[in-house]
Amino acid sequence: MATNYIFVTGGVVSSLGKGIAAASLAAILEARGLNVTMMKLDPYINVDPGTMSPTQHGEVFVTQDGAETDLDLGHYERFIRTKMTKRNNFTTGKIYSEVLRKERRGDYLGATVQVIPHITNEIKARVIEGAAGHDVAIVEVGGTVGDIESLPFLEALRQLAVQVGREKTIFMHLTLVPYIPTAGEVKTKPTQHSVKELLSIGIQPDVLICRSDRMVPPNERAKIALFCNVPEKAVISLKDVDSIYRIPALLQSQGLDDLICQRFRLACKEADLSEWEQVLYRQANPTGDVTIGMVGKYVELPDAYKSVNEALKHAGLTNRLNVHIKYIDSQDVETKGIDVLKGVDGILVPGGFGYRGVEGKILTAQYARENNIPYLGICLGMQVAFIEYARHVAGLTQANSSEFDKNCPQPVVGLITEWQDADGSVEQRSENSDLGGTMRLGAQQCHLIEGSKARELYGKETIEERHRHRYEVNNTLLPQIEAAGLKVTGLSADKKLVEIIEVPNHPWFVACQFHPEFTSTPRDGHPLFAGFVKAAKENQKK
């Protein structure tokens, strides 16, 4: 069966939740037995978000095959079972770099290279490639209609709709329908103007998703339908909700999935949303509360740790607990002392880059170790725990990472210069390598040691988790630290790289070099996060 396409755009303002709405629709279609994939087209000129500031762009989501992508792909994987790959996200920068590479190679046979047709053709080719083999591909265009940056993407999708046939495509437009308290009513004019903007570039939306803080009344939906050339049943109200996992049921209750299946002439079963009902039931009926202190460098923007935040919530669902996250700036630990860490049931130190705030993270690991506070370290969170143990238990008082001190006499953490990627190919790096796209990335196998907490939590010997780092434990100094008691409980497939460490004689102190948050979902959770939150709850009783 040829792929059907749903193109998702946004209007009026940014941050309307296109990714969540698109992922929720994908979840309903998947629940109807359809094979669904999703794509995000980002109109910025960076080749990928890998070198962008987390406080500007939010987290970088790493796919199984090692692509550094937009955080919306994390939403996609949390809502549907399909795993995202490098084909599911591309940027203006990636498109232009590929077109320029082809031009230098002579692929265009001396033609004048232009936005139309060369850039738009490259966009279309990538969308078709990413959608291949699926019943439905939902393609989200980043930004807001009217922005100059997104014009090539919109033109490419307009052309693609003509080429594959309008009966195989749906344009779904998210727009804001604000409520004006002084007037006591919602206003439809912003939506009308947004649709007018879309029409000016040749796109007639088929479905309108109306974002508001309340349900849009039927008379206002009828008005929107009339003035935007859309059937009334295709004007969907999407109000603010207390949980994003309510949105699939909210969209289904208004018949959005039926409308789409009818348009595409898809004969499929009714959606079974029972798994999502279970998620909502557990969320609404917690048996207790737990507070996790997250000590990071980018805490002013919680989206910098989006997948970690969600993974903690998923662990709360698994344990029937309401998880409260207390964000603590690691620099505050340096300047104000360990008092800022008090009052939490567990401590999580997530990933990060650069020296700023690192000593605060090391102090945090020491506080958790010495006070028997459950600790989960991720990526840099493992490295600081390793440095702390080396300094204060193993007697390597000058221990540090070469990332923070290139002349460190005891570099217990150093640059990885060679490793195997997920395909078995050997990757090599040096200190002079580019920052972008040069880390150990994507899913890697990890061997768990018998009798370890990690082995107990996962329940198997070999796991696969996603990585994003260029520094690792220095094996030269590792024997001294192991002799002081630290347990290495997870190793890379070739047994050369340390993946998990555990502190002995501690209720729960586990740190991993990989990023378990990227594989946590609301329906399945993740064993490390579930075990950590459970240990934090048990810590309350002491």
From Swiss-Prot:
Active site: 379, 515, 517
Keyword ATP-binding: yes
GO biological process: 'de novo' CTP biosynthetic process; pyrimidine nucleobase biosynthetic process
Binding-site list for ATP: 15-20, 72, 239-241
One function term, GO molecular function aspect: ATP binding
Residues bound to L-glutamine: 352, 380-383, 403, 470
Binding site for UTP: 14, 187-192, 223
Annotated Mg(2+) binding sites: 72, 140
Pathway info: Pyrimidine metabolism; CTP biosynthesis via de novo pathway; CTP from UDP: step 2/2
Regulation affecting activity: Allosterically activated by GTP, when glutamine is the substrate; GTP has no effect on the reaction when ammonia is the substrate. The allosteric effector GTP functions by stabilizing the protein conformation that binds the tetrahedral intermediate(s) formed during glutamine hydrolysis. Inhibited by the product CTP, via allosteric rather than competitive inhibition.
Enzyme Commission number(s) of this protein: 6.3.4.2
UniProt keyword terms in alphabetical order: ATP-binding, Glutamine amidotransferase, Ligase, Magnesium, Metal-binding, Nucleotide-binding, Pyrimidine biosynthesis
Subunit composition and interactions: Homotetramer.
Function of the protein: Catalyzes the ATP-dependent amination of UTP to CTP with either L-glutamine or ammonia as the source of nitrogen. Regulates intracellular CTP levels through interactions with the four ribonucleotide triphosphates.
The family this protein is said to belong to: Belongs to the CTP synthase family.
Protein name: CTP synthase
Organism: Mannheimia succiniciproducens (strain KCTC 0769BP / MBEL55E)
Phylogenetic placement of the source organism: Bacteria, Pseudomonadati, Pseudomonadota, Gammaproteobacteria, Pasteurellales
Gene that this polypeptide is encoded by: pyrG
